[in-house]
Amino acid sequence: MLHDLINPVNHFCRKTVIKVLEVDIARNCNIVHSRVQGEIQVVTKVFVSAQEVAEKAGVSRSAVSRTFTPGASVAPETRKRVMEAAEALGYHVNHLARGLMRNESGIVCLIVSEMGTPYRSSLIRAVTQHLQNSGKIAMLINTDRSDGSVDRALRQAIRYRADASIILSGLPDKSITQLCLKNGQRLVLINRDDDQPGPLRINLDDQEAAGRILTAFVRAGCRRLAFANSEVGTPSLMAREHGFVAAAAALGMEVAVERFGSTGYEAGKVVAQRLLTRKERPDAIFCANDLLACGVMDAARHQFMMSVPDQLCVAGFDDIEQASWSSYDLTTFAQPVEAIAREAVAFLAAPGVADEEAQVQTLKLHAELVWRGSIRGG
């Protein structure tokens, strides 16, 4: 470690000489170095300031500020001198400091759990890309999905003066939501079941999707229906389960429901084992997401020697990359990831400020059914 190599020559001196053979200290660590007779001279260095640029260019501090402010008036010769000085010194505008003076930081917090799952990672990619395109910077806060961890994450977002937070996991307490709004922070809840006023809720019409997949199963001749879910119990997962059960009940049909573990592949295998060992073995299983569906299909084929879709029809949700693989060829619903990201960022960029007295705002999007080979007659 660096502190193990440094032997201070003077406790009060900002310059320390250390004898090493081949040590390079990168400039981006905010330290510059030079070699002097086989020694490395380490000098602590703060970021280049606008005042330093002004002095080098021979202009005023305000001229530097105007040069780096879009639309501001500055003479061409002055701009040229400032830009040359900035390039020579390695100066970059401190957008954080500038934003705080304008009461905006440009920071948007993404509060999320299970970032490694295919759907969640694709959503993070889309949201961060749209934020960057709009001139915002994303600050990712990883939570454990519990509501308490979401509350802590939002308090952290307030401390960093974030302009907004986009919540992909968990649900904040009403008092925390109001605290965010009172501090001028806008909120977006994605696939969260919450009727608190102020935030924008972006949800899918999960119940409508469940009704469509039920119709597909019935047309394929399926009569013994099942739903495979996890024990996570997120609003979107439960909406799909309840929508499927309700749609079946409307046709006088029952649904065998099994829940286990997380929304992952291994949980799907366990759920399939429970469902397929029942006396009334299902001939159609709607899975809360694609990872569960992949586990269900593999268990059905390898443990129970069943043919998909000839003996068992399976459908999933999310349209992750694996769903299109020939080994699964899974019929599923595609989450409108780009539309979700676009609408979330557009809401944050729209005129107006956060208001704890605002009305409930909900945007419901459509999930596209992607037909593949896991349902007969698709």
What is the predicted role of each segment?
Residues 95, 113-122, 140-149, 192, ...:
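Hinge/beta->alpha junction and helix N-cap segments in small-molecule ligand-binding domains
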Residues 5-104:
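N-terminal helix-turn-helix DNA-binding module of bacterial transcription factors
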Residues 60, 106, 163, 222-224, ...:
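Short acidic/polar active-site loop segments enriched in Thr and Asp
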Residues 54, 167, 286-288:
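Short beta-strand scaffold positions
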Residues 3-45, 103-215, 219, 276-277:
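Alpha-helical recognition/docking segments in bacterial nutrient-uptake
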Residues 10-21, 35-36, 278-378:
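Flexible loop/turn connectors
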Residues 86, 131, 247-248, 276, ...:
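Conserved hydrophobic residues forming the short capping helix/wall of the S-adenosyl-L-methionine
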Residues 133-134, 183, 247-254, 278-280, ...:
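Short helix-capping segments at alpha-helix termini
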